[in-house]
Amino acid sequence: MLPKFTIIVATTALMGLGTVASAESCLEVTLTGTQGGPPVFQGQAGSGTLVTYGTQENKCRDVLLQFDTGRGTTQQLSKIGVPAGKVTAVFFTHIHSDHSEGLADLMQLRWHFNSGGPKVDVVCHQDAKSGAGHTMSCEKFAAHIGDALIHSGEMAQRLAENPKRLPGGPADLLNVSTFGPSQAPAVVWEKGDVTVSAISSRHVAGHASYRVDTPAGSVVIGGDAGNDAAAPPRDTSTSSQVELLAKDADILVHSVIHPVMGPLGTTGFPPPIYYRQSTATDLGSLAARAGVDNLMYTHLIPPLGAPRQGPYPLPAPLTADDYVGSAREGGFEGNVVVGADLAKLRLTAE
């Protein structure tokens, strides 16, 4: 695929690939949190990706889209100068706590200081019933994000000191929009030049993956998607739906598990959980087949430098080279970003 965009890569170490001339529009992708799963390691934030689009003069921040809100999302946004009141919309790949628990904090802060609005669009899959009989509900999650503070009395106290705040708490600031299951990309949100499409993908009931298209480029947020087959035998661990969504995308952001965590290793990591993730090697293959230019690994299992993934010990801590090597083994020759918190890519329209 011929290069259409100039890429700036930055990480917490402020690594760069050069400078570019000012362009009319730009798209920026920032990994707000890269912790894989519920464990914590060295202060990494929970899973989340900020996608912003706009003019270079406005730092690509005319539209700000947050995909998943793991723990610490609000603090991470503050580090890059994004106030809670500036987020345009929030999208959930699925309602697991490591991807969603930061919404209450984000919206409580917004309720304190921006209770007059505007409301925040929350976009997610409609209620989905699992094979085990339980229902995953983004709508109920959003409706009840302030319940603990309501029942503790804090909401009443805050309203007494400022009756202009919305009486229902932070949930009153949410405009929830859901979509149904789809095996083909379907538009779920639009604003100006920005279009967001979604497709159903396998992980837990109601899991979805997203694609953002703008004049400055495109990015796919795979979430925790894995293959429709729950375990081998299968050709790959990756999602055919994500591969369809990622065709010719400029950037693919995807959660990743390293093969060292597999059942042939010594970590003792549960095979059913391993098999529902996409491996670093297979994601490299998917990115190559789809014609993706940039592959951003996030939600790393295990984290870089970690001696263990939760209670599961590793034979040795992994480095970025271990993840990049797996992508190359899968046949991907493009740019690989092994996610650290606040790593970013910027696309600028030529």
Model segments located where?
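Cap/insert and terminal regions of metallo-dependent hydrolase folds
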Residues: 205, 216-218, 226-340
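Binuclear metal-dependent hydrolase catalytic cores
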Residues: 23-219, 231, 310, 319-320, ...
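Conserved CoA-thioester-binding segment of acyl-CoA-metabolizing enzymes
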Residues: 222
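Positively charged n-region of N-terminal signal peptides that target proteins for export
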Residues: 1-5
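Bacterial N-terminal signal peptides
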Residues: 6-17
